[in-house]
Amino acid sequence: AKFPGITAPALGRYVSMTQRLKSVLLAGGGGGARLARGFYGLLNEAETLVLTNPGDDFEHLGLLICPDTDSVLYAVSDAIDAKRGWGRQSESWSVLAEVERLGGPGWLQLGDRDIAMHLLRREGLDAGRSLAQVTADLAKRLGIHSLQVVPASEQPIRTVLTTTEGDLDFQSYFVGRQCQPEVLSINFRGAADATPAPDLIEF
């Protein structure tokens, strides 16, 4: 990893120090995923927890989509599409093409490999496992064995924008409508009742 403006000796001292400390990285969006990837391998993985943003999570086609959490998982496991900065590398699009052919929504670019992740997440949640447990399992399936990747809360937190076209979740506004409707207000539904992830408290 490269850290502009930080000399090698200074970085070495920092890494040496962090090897003896517990570290929590707050990761949201593509920048958070790149941060997690940059520090992966430098910090003591067993003593590092990456806390991901659940505010962009939403339901789509019956699946729970966790964009920020998945971006971290893909980035750390080197499975992310580096050119786009999101999604899986070597992706295919057969399912999306068929959904569109059958008249379903095609605005969200979900590739076949990405959909496989969402299906496994849904299976785990439907079996009664927590979001943190399901995320940990997905991390292991991607080859991440010691670094903890944990959604910030088990309770749903949804970013909802009230616009001139009505209420839209963040992805519908940002991706589906390309930020076109005028935003009147922003609400974080569920935030007031959400509690920190148990794994964070125990960490």
Per-segment meaning from a language model:
Residues 2-17:
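Short, Lys/Arg-enriched N-terminal segments with co-localized hydrophobic residues
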Residues 25, 50-51:
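Structural beta-sheet core signal
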Residues 28:
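Glycine-rich Rossmann-fold phosphate-binding loop(s) that bind the pyrophosphate
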Residues 31-36:
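Short glycine/serine/threonine-rich phosphate/pyrophosphate-binding segments
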Residues 43-49:
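A generic structural motif
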Residues 53-194:
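Electropositive, gly/pro-rich neighborhoods at or near active sites that engage anionic ligands
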Residues 195-203:
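A short, well-structured juxtamembrane/interface segment
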